[in-house]
Regions:
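Sec-dependent signal peptide recognition
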Residues: 2-8
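Hydrophobic h-region of N-terminal signal peptides that target proteins for export
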Residues: 8-17
Length: 613
């Protein structure tokens, strides 16, 4: 779309100004210089566009510079809030900005395009009650910098909030009292989704992440398939964030499509901050027809599954005097009961192992967590504030599986840490999980999983801000069931690689991606070019991974996103697979929607077995 407008402006500037087109001998010096600074093209375009009113209006309205304005470093640091530590909070004022026009750095800006003005009028701003019920701070309390930072992060994590800033305003007549101004900016919460899987199937959906500004979510999707029944199905959901200010999230849904037929209801409360004393959740799901236990499960059944799934957990913070000087440290004890009963399922495998077994599982965990956050931007988002976690989460889990095919014990150790190095330019996350079920005959369904995630500093190349992302993952299955295999077509493998033949009990993957955030936006849509290289190897558990054949994918792509809208990121990707199996083409192109990647936040959780996926 951007290049269409560029071409229109160039053609219009030539025709409306009366200038002719002449062909001259190439100036190699100018070409080389332009390659070094691609923004010169837009600067030149702006000059051409300014020659008449029509093209000047198109350029100013549609193509704009999105370089970040100078950000007050005090607003970005913990030290800013620390200067007001223990001051009494006098008043809390909440100001909600329009979606289009102003931002947190200049609240006086206004929307200029008619479509932006219309969207501002149609949108229902988050009510003051919704914002206040998500506040941990109260008038009359002593100001705690950690609480302020955590509260900002909590509000930013809400699906209908774009960004938030807490501004401290000292009182001139009383130095011991401060007022707090909270600036919030919503996203346009109404959205559409859709996709075409092939000529025979597709879907279209509609949703609202902030119904009437009260923080409720509702959505429905029509899913069609001409070859499978029901030919036209639907799935709907309804959820409430933070029911009555208790920080309990409620969700319920029903679906009847060719993929599955089920209904569910859930309540969840997390350890949202280190000071959280308790957390837990309840979930009930009745699945009448499905090929998986969970939609993110890697194991699928060739025959329909019919089952009842119940799950409940509770966790509590332990105050045992361990590390009392660290306010970001949290030690938790949690327990879980998970029940599943099948009414229809496939037969056991040749070894009489049954992945889809009737089971009641009891789990307990002891977790040690330390977490804090650094603010940055242009990591996974496109200019809004992002909270980068640093710290660790270590957990020890024990369990007992009351299984119809034989009772067994379970245990795992999970270690993870993430930090920033060299005054915040680089981020490195590592994790190691080792676990297994235990029977009298030995261990089964064991796993060793090692991950490394690296994010580079934001650097400039050809006057464009860029980052590099590197992920390394090594997973080994130990005595896994025959039906359980690792593949290369999920988020840990090779993107766009749809092979069903490349699988095994052991996997090694390396993903390298370079992202180039563009300095220009069109109608508030930001974009980023990216290049990638994915390498994956799978094989049997009893053989060296380096003796197996490798698969790879490399290519380029474009991501387009507006942080003012609730829509997912639009992605165009072209890939080449040099060493591909027969069920994968050598060239792959895709246009799809992708969800925003999230950081691992070192938040204590309910105990559950390590996933082999």
């Amino acid at each position: 779309m951007k290049f269409v407008w560029v071409i229109l402006i160039l053609l219009s500037s030539l025709s409306l100004s009366g200038e002719g087109i002449s062909i001259q001998k190439k100036d190699t010096a100018k070409v080389a210089f332009a390659k070094k600074d691609p923004n010169l093209f837009y600067d030149s375009l702006e000059v051409k566009a300014s020659r008449n009113q029509v093209t000047r209006w198109i350029f100013n309205k549609l193509i704009s510079t999105t370089k970040k304005e100078a950000i007050n470093p005090e607003l970005q640091s913990y030290e800013y809030y620390r200067t007001y530590e223990k001051k009494i909070i006098g008043s809390i004022v909440i100001k909600s900005l329009e979606i289009f026009g102003p931002d947190l750095y200049d609240t006086t800006k206004t929307a200029t395009l008619w479509i932006e003005k219309t969207a501002n009028k149609l949108h229902s701003k988050s009510s003051l009650y919704v914002i206040r019920k998500n506040l941990w701070i109260k008038e009359g309390q002593a100001l705690d910098p950690n609480t302020i930072m955590d509260n900002e992060r909590l509000l930013r994590s809400l699906p209908y909030i774009k960004d938030v800033r807490f501004i401290i305003v000292p009182r001139k007549l009383n130095e011991d009292v401060v007022d707090i101004l909270i600036l919030t900016q919503d996203v346009f919460s109404f959205g559409l989704s859709g996709g075409i899987g092939s000529i025979n199937n597709g879907e279209i959906g509609i949703y609202d992440k902030n119904v009437l500004g009260i923080g409720h979510e509702i959505g429905t999707t029509l899913i069609a398939n001409t070859n499978q029944s029901p030919h036209i199905g639907f799935e709907s959901y309804y959820s409430i964030n933070n029911v009555k200010g208790n920080f309990i999230d409620f969700s319920t849904g029903y679906s009847n499509t060719y993929l599955y037929h089920r209904l569910f209801v859930s309540f969840e409360r997390d350890f949202l901050r280190p000071q959280s004393t308790n957390a837990g959740g309840l979930m009930a799901m009745r699945s009448f027809r499905s090929d998986k236990i969970n939609q993110d499960d890697f194991v699928t059944s060739k025959s329909p599954l019919d089952y009842l799934f119940l799950d409940g957990w509770y966790g509590r913070k332990l105050n045992l005097g361990i590390n009392p000087k660290d306010s970001r440290f949290q030690m938790t004890l949690s327990g879980r009961i998970r029940y599943i009963s099948f009414y229809q399922r496939p037969l056991p495998d040749i070894n009489n192992n049954q992945y889809f077994a009737n089971s009641t599982m009891y789990l307990g965990s002891l977790s040690f967590s330390q977490r804090s956050y650094i603010r940055d931007y242009l990591v996974y988002s496109y200019g809004i504030t992002e909270d980068i976690p640093k710290g660790y989460l270590h957990e020890l889990v024990f369990g007992f599986d009351k299984n119809e095919f034989g009772n067994r014990l379970y245990s795992h150790l999970f270690l993870s840490t993430g930090n920033l190095f060299k005054n915040k330019p680089y981020y490195l996350y590592t994790s190691l999980g080792v676990g297994s079920y235990w029977k009298r005959t030995g261990l089964e369904q064991g796993i060793v999983d090692f991950k490394v995630n690296f994010i580079s500093q934001l650097f400039n190349i050809w006057n464009v801000q860029a980052r590099q992302f590197i992920k390394l993952n090594y997973t080994v299955g130990i005595n896994r069931f025959e039906i359980e295999d690792l593949g290369l077509h999920n988020s840990e493998g090779i993107r766009g690689f749809g092979s069903s033949t490349e699988k095994g009990k052991k996997r090694l993957t390396l993903n390298i991606e370079n992202v180039f955030f563009q300095n220009r936006s069109i109608l508030n849509f930001q974009s980023a070019l990216f290049s990638f290289l994915d390498i994956g190897i799978v094989g049997p558990a009893n053989q060296s991974i380096f003796k197996q054949n490798y698969n790879a994918g490399l290519g380029i792509g474009l991501r387009i996103r507006s942080e003012n809208l609730i829509f997912k990121t639009i992605q165009l990707r072209l890939a080449y697979y040099p060493n591909h199996p027969n069920d994968v083409n050598s060239i792959g192109f895709i246009l799809d929607e992708v969800s925003k990647t999230k950081f691992y936040n070192f938040q204590p959780r309910g105990p559950e077995p390590l996933k082999f996926e």
